[in-house]
Amino acid sequence: MSKLIKLTSITAVSSTLAASYYFYFVDRDGFHYQNSQWKKIGDKVQGIIDGSENINPSTPSNSNQVIVVKRPMTETMKDLWNEQIRNTANWFYSWGK
């Protein structure tokens, strides 16, 4: 009985692999394979290696830049302290409402 189960499981796995291979690579002239991201990247890399395709350098846009302001740590701590004081005062005053 165990040989029958083993044979059935091997047949099921083999059939599943064969069907997935057929539908991915063969059916509709390999539509899914030709349009896959891995294939496109592989073709682009192969073109760069062969010299038939150029690398287009990207130019950074100025609109996405973030301005960073460096502040002393004491100012940041003062801001955090003041925020906590304001929140505590609002909490106390909310009792009277």
UniProtKB/Swiss-Prot annotation:
- What membrane topology term does the record carry? Single-pass membrane protein
Q: Which GO terms describe its biological process?
A: cristae formation
Where is this protein primarily located?
mitochondrion
Q: Which UniProt keywords apply?
A: Membrane, Mitochondrion, Mitochondrion inner membrane, Transmembrane, Transmembrane helix
- Compartments, record wording: Mitochondrion inner membrane
Membrane-spanning ranges? 7-24
InterPro entries, per database record: Mic12
Q: Which GO terms describe its cellular component?
A: MICOS complex; mitochondrial crista junction
Taxonomically, the superkingdom here is: Eukaryota
Report the protein's function.
Component of the MICOS complex, a large protein complex of the mitochondrial inner membrane that plays crucial roles in the maintenance of crista junctions, inner membrane architecture, and formation of contact sites to the outer membrane.
What family does the Swiss-Prot or TrEMBL record give for this protein?
Belongs to the MICOS complex subunit Mic12 family.
The entry describes its oligomerization and partners as:
Component of the mitochondrial contact site and cristae organizing system (MICOS) complex.
The protein's name in its UniProt record: MICOS complex subunit MIC12
Native species? Zygosaccharomyces rouxii (strain ATCC 2623 / CBS 732 / NBRC 1130 / NCYC 568 / NRRL Y-229)
GN (gene name) = AIM5
